[in-house]
Amino acid sequence: GIFLNALKNFAKTAGKGVLQSVLNTASCKLSKQC
């Protein structure tokens, strides 16, 4: 239902945010700019 869809959308958005920060951390470590 609506609740499940909202939960899925939230998980997708949260997952993107986590992935983005992991990528940012990894790239800053690789370029030694942390």
From Swiss-Prot:
Disulphide linkage map: C28-C34
Annotated localization: Secreted
Protein name per UniProt: Brevinin-2Rf
A cellular component annotation (GO) from this entry: extracellular region
Family: Belongs to the frog skin active peptide (FSAP) family. Brevinin subfamily.
Keywords: Antimicrobial, Disulfide bond, Secreted
Domain of life: Eukaryota
InterPro entries in the record: Antimicrobial_frog_2
Functional note: Antimicrobial peptide.
Single biological process term from Gene Ontology: defense response
Keyword Secreted: yes
Main localization (coarse): secreted
Tissue-by-tissue expression: Expressed by the skin glands.
